[in-house]
């Protein structure tokens, strides 16, 4: 059975996200996601972004915008009901810049709160539409699991990799690895090992970080839609990496910049009484016009 839906394509720091504007039942998320991820929006619909500048624009993930009831915050479900920081800040940008739902602050900045799958509380965003920039409060980790490099079979590649941390961001868990080369084969082995120890996670990522350059290569698996991607950038993984860096710091405010395959993300953490109290994440983004598609 065919259906017509309206979508927009978002480019939050290269983590290309398709937003479905038409209300869709949750049980249809998987089928629609599978269809949308096959479409080249650059070649078929003329979508073009400045960074990365490519004639091909393929989605990496799909978010479904929820119908709003009176008094409710704007909301979004990711296709696997996971959490995604890049999708969340792009959704907040769409709500403020395109629908006028933000509250004005000084200097042309707007703020609003949203709700999202994989996070049990609202998140607050700051939007600068003229600068194509959005910052969002990130959820704090709900659990931390420590592995050794030897336990993960990585000691031969990096003998200095003593402690590795799996950071559970509630809707997605990320393994943070320094100075380990990324590959799908390695990712599959790491996922198998982590799942054997921690159970089957809804969504799992490995953040492969070159410690000298702070270049981060994100690989993410979402169980319910069975997708694995080398992502252009990963916001929740970047926040998890910043959290691990913050574990090494004294109380204070610290900023970290992580370059990624298709964009750069910026994080700020605040540490108080030996605990990380806040994480925010920001970066550039772009949106396409509304596109109507027959599936």
For each predicted feature, which ranges?
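Short, cationic low-complexity segments
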Residues: 153-170
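Long, low-complexity, Lys/Arg-enriched
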Residues: 131-135
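Intrinsically disordered, low-complexity regions enriched in acidic/Ser/Thr/Pro/Gln residues
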Residues: 136-140, 145, 149-151, 165, ...
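A glycine-rich beta-to-alpha transition motif near the start of alpha/beta enzyme domains, typified by
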Residues: 1-130, 143, 166-168, 173-295
């Amino acid at each position: 059975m065919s259906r017509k839906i309206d979508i927009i394509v978002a480019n939050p720091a290269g983590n290309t996200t398709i937003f479905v504007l038409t209300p869709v039942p949750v049980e249809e998320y998987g089928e629609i996601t599978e269809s949308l991820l096959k479409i080249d929006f650059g070649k078929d619909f003329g979508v073009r972004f400045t960074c990365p500048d490519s004639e091909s624009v393929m989605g990496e993930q799909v978010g479904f915008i929820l119908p709003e009831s009176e008094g409710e915050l704007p909301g979004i479900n990711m296709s696997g009901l996971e959490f995604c920081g890049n999708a969340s800040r792009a959704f907040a940008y769409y709500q403020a810049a395109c629908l006028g739902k933000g509250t004005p602050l000084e200097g042309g900045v707007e703020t609003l709160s949203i709700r999202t799958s994989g996070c049990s509380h609202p998140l607050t965003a700051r939007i600068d539409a003229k600068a194509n920039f959005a910052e969002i409060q990130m959820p704090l980790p709900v659990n931390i699991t420590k592995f050794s490099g030897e336990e993960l079979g990585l000691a031969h590649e990096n003998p200095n990799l003593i402690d590795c941390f799996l950071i559970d961001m509630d809707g997605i868990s990320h393994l943070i690895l320094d100075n380990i080369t990324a590959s799908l084969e390695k990712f599959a082995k790491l996922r198998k090992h982590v799942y054997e120890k921690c159970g089957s996670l809804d969504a799992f990522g490995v953040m492969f970080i070159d410690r000298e350059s702070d270049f981060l290569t994100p690989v993410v698996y979402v169980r319910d839609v069975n997708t694995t991607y080398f992502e252009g950038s990963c916001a929740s993984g970047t926040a998890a990496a910043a959290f691990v860096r913050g574990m090494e710091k004294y109380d204070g405010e610290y900023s970290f910049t992580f370059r990624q395959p298709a964009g750069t993300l910026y994080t700020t953490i605040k540490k108080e009484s030996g605990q990380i109290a806040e994480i925010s994440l920001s970066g550039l983004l772009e949106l396409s016009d509304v596109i109507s598609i027959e599936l």
